[in-house]
Amino acid sequence: MTKEKLENELKTLPNSAGVYEYFNQEGKLLYVGKAKNLKNRVKSYFAFTPNLHANPGNSLRIQKMIQETVHLEFITTNSEADALILENSFIKQLHPKYNILLRDDKTYPYIYVDFKEEFPRFEITRKLVKKSKIKYFGPFFKGARELLDALYLYYPLKQKASCKSPCIFYQISRCLAPCDKRISKEKYREILDEAMHALLNPSVLLKNLEKQMLVLAQNENYEEAAKIRDQIATIKDLEVKVEIDIAKLEDFEVFALAFKNSMLSTLRFVVQNGKIISVNSKITPIKNDIQWDKNEIYKQLILENFSMDIPLLASVIYVYEEFEDRMLLEKILSQRFDKKISIKIPKIGEKRKICDLAFQNALLNIEKEQKNHDFTIQKELKSYFELENLPNDIEIFDNSHLQGVANVGAMVTYSVNSWDKSKYRKFHLKHKNDYDQMREVLTRRALDFDKIPPPDLWLIDGGKVLLDLAKEIILSTGANVDILAISKEKIDAKAHRAKGGAKDKIHSLKGEFSLSVNDKKLQFLQKLRDEAHRFAISFHQNTKKKQDLKSSKLANLGLSLGVIQKLLAYYGNFESIYKADFKDLAMLVGKKAAQKIKEN
């Protein structure tokens, strides 16, 4: 596609709000943006004389992006607010090359109390609880369960959600049996108020726990004392040491960004009743370190942290600095939560001090990250294999089966120098050959890009054929993901797997690479492949055991192994065999065998 074609596309832009997308010569998505007026916004990227080129008045990052752009697409929306929400969704799902993606798809827990209950108690939730008299505390980015356990350990509140008579907790003085009316509502409320005060003031809770730990140790109950010691350590880790006096007992949130040495640091303070009760920080390596866009980051950060299904306790959000779409975000959040939400930049006073503190901590977190993690290998991979992204988030895929039995796939995740086991995935597969199995696994993962953002790199256990397959799937999604594959060298058209002699080759879209066995890049990729292989084999073995157990049940009915395999090949799994219609079974394996299955 030529620049002439792009110039013609620019002429079709409407004077309405919407989202625009830039693509390169290979059809890869470069950038997603939103506009109040698509025609004016998109044309501001270009200069038109003597011919079409990047506007020199824009940043170097934008100029470089426009130089690569050969095609644009756009979607109109009813308003700029709708465009901003759609833009954020596209960035998360498609991971464009020149957009910065904040990888935090977690929902964090809140502790809440339902005052509609006769004797309220603390519970944990990650979503909005649709009841009228709920008080929330949080979100807590870590340690919510430990806090809750500590509260129930020290304060004799109702321990069970439903209980009709005094239980073991009453016998050990951990509950005052409100279920049996052994405590008045007024006295119970006094204890609950003390517990809520302790929740907002962890130092109070710590003092109480330390006293209890000492008593247990003196009574030689060392096991329980050790549990409390661990709770104390967790709660101490939650405490935020702030020498700023927030005079008012108010609720608000604080956000700050810092950028240094190609690292983006985001930080969030949650303030309730004038106390910082929770802190969340995140480090994101920037893949295109020419420049970064604070407006883009603040938009993502605030929209992702305040999704529609969570409680928003504060009505004021303070940010460290001004950004372009601040007022628009105010409007979106106010509509989303049906109340007035303000996003402010404080100039003086305690709010300015706390914003400055958030920024200072964001900078410190970058320094800590760089001391703790070495990104040398990622930089070497990016340079050597000419990757578009710095591969900090890597997904590795492998399949496992035994002659078409117990077909499974596995995905493991390596994120910023460590395994992220919370994102490991297992797949039961329908297909029997390696190619179709990998297609099934990769397609299922790609379909989840809108829920779990794509990584920087896919590593496939296989050769060029599977590499091309992965490329086809990624191109179909429009996502910006680099791809590598690792396979054993072939001798006489067969993979050479002799112990001690097996040599791996790396396949990229740029070609095939044979690296020295001592090469750190090869060893790193082998480590990733081996973990995926281990995970896939383990899942295959467990699946095979379960299938063997179920197969033995059918064998006990007098069905031959051939009949069982025929049934599995047709129905895919044992559950479908048992649920199958008698007529269908009879047509496949005969009436006698079908009758045995249905009768048992």
Swiss-Prot record:
One GO molecular-function entry: DNA binding
Signal peptide (residue range): none
Entry's localization field: Cytoplasm
GO CC terms, sorted: cytoplasm; excinuclease repair complex
Superkingdom to which the source organism belongs: Bacteria
A Pfam family: UVR
One Gene Ontology term from the biological process aspect of the record: SOS response
KW Glycoprotein (keyword) present: no
Residue ranges of the TM segments: none
Keywords carried by this UniProt record: Cytoplasm, DNA damage, DNA excision, DNA repair, Excision nuclease, SOS response
Domain called UVR: residue spans: 203-238
Domain GIY-YIG: 15-100
Function noted in UniProt: The UvrABC repair system catalyzes the recognition and processing of DNA lesions. UvrC both incises the 5' and 3' sides of the lesion. The N-terminal half is responsible for the 3' incision and the C-terminal half is responsible for the 5' incision.
NCBIfam families the record matches: uvrC
Subunit architecture: Interacts with UvrB in an incision complex.
Similarity section: Belongs to the UvrC family.
The protein's name: UvrABC system protein C
Name of encoding gene: uvrC
